[in-house]
UniProtKB/Swiss-Prot annotation:
One of its GO terms (cellular component) is cytoplasm. One of its GO terms (biological process) is keto-3-deoxy-D-manno-octulosonic acid biosynthetic process. It is found in: Cytoplasm. Keywords: Cytoplasm, Lipopolysaccharide biosynthesis, Transferase. It holds the Pfam family DAHP_synth_1. Pathway: Carbohydrate biosynthesis; 3-deoxy-D-manno-octulosonate biosynthesis; 3-deoxy-D-manno-octulosonate from D-ribulose 5-phosphate: step 2/3; Bacterial outer membrane biogenesis; lipopolysaccharide biosynthesis. The keyword Methyltransferase does not apply. Disulfide bonds: none annotated. It catalyses: D-arabinose 5-phosphate + phosphoenolpyruvate + H2O = 3-deoxy-alpha-D-manno-2-octulosonate-8-phosphate + phosphate. Its EC number is 2.5.1.55. This is 2-dehydro-3-deoxyphosphooctonate aldolase.
Length: 284
């Protein structure tokens, strides 16, 4: 792709992500934990982003369909979850993102959200990708933990063949033996060469899959470390799950950062990003 071609994705009619655009944060609790809590978290995160000049998309899941154990909390379900996300969108004026797990969910979810997210485990599911593409919404695809960054070209081709125009690709760590992930930061420029803005998922990258036996564990203390490294390599957006009290969260608490730590973390990332403000690419 020629260097004169701008790499951007539109988030509805709100803003763009990519070349020449401010950093965007995809942030919020892992799973929807209630209406009032979602509104409170969205408003609090939005205020931090406003102070720092960061574009903000609220994210939260209506269903965590791939929890480690059958007894883990999955969420409020499609209907109630979308109602809560729609309230965040309309009352706070924020764009929203959530993930879909089945093809038949795409059209319904797209009526509410601004960005459809394809989970990493499902990123090669052709029917799911085509259903998401058909909605006309922006699509964020998480690279599978088992997939090479250059193999994401096939995912991008499926979505483009399906009519998707605004695509984002997310790095969230790669399998490193059992119960461990490692981040290969080469994936960011390599995926960006596919013509899509790139996102770094700083919180799932510190996950320890199945590390607590019947649930995943994590090392949230390394979230700022990896986020700064990603900013140095070059990112268009940052994905971070955020909670008022992660130790009491209903899903992925060990990976999530505390709301109280968000502003300081973002300030560090912005300073790094500004210091290395050059085009992102893998070419020498």
């Amino acid at each position: 792709m020629g260097q004169s071609t701008l790499i951007r994705a539109k988030v509805g009619d709100r803003f763009s992500i990519g070349d020449g655009c401010p950093l965007t944060l995809f942030g919020g609790p892992c799973v929807i934990e209630g209406e009032d809590f979602s509104l409170k978290m969205a408003e609090s995160i939005a205020k931090v982003c406003d102070r720092l000049g960061v574009q903000f998309v609220f994210k939260s899941s209506f269903d965590k369909a791939n929890r480690t154990s059958i007894g883990s909390f999955r969420g409020y379900g499609l209907e109630e979850g979308l109602r809560i996300l729609e309230r965040v969108k309309t009352e706070l004026g924020l764009p929203v993102l959530t993930d879909i797990h089945e093809s038949q969910q795409a059209a319904t979810v797209a009526e509410v959200v601004d960005i459809l997210q394809i989970p990493a485990f499902l990123c090669r599911q052709t029917d799911l990708l085509l259903a998401a593409a058909a909605t006309g919404r922006t699509v964020n695809v998480k690279k599978a933990q088992f997939l090479a960054p250059w193999d994401m070209k096939n995912v991008v081709n499926k979505l483009r063949q399906g009519g998707a125009e605004n695509l984002l690709l997310t790095e969230r760590g790669s399998c490193f033996g059992y119960n461990a992930l490692v981040v290969d930061f080469r994936s960011l420029p390599l995926m960006r060469e596919l013509g899509c803005p790139v996102v770094f998922d700083a919180t799932h990258s510190v996950q320890i899959p199945g590390g607590a036996g019947d649930r995943s564990s994590g090392q949230r203390e390394f979230v700022p470390v990896l986020a700064r490294a990603a900013a140095a390599v070059g990112i268009d957006a940052l994905f971070m799950e955020i909670h008022e009290n992660p130790d009491q969260a209903l899903s992925d608490g060990p990976n999530m950062i505390r709301l109280a730590d968000l502003e300081a973390t973002l300030r560090q990332i912005l300073r790094v990003r500004e210091a290395v403000a050059e085009p992102i690419g893998a070419s020498a």
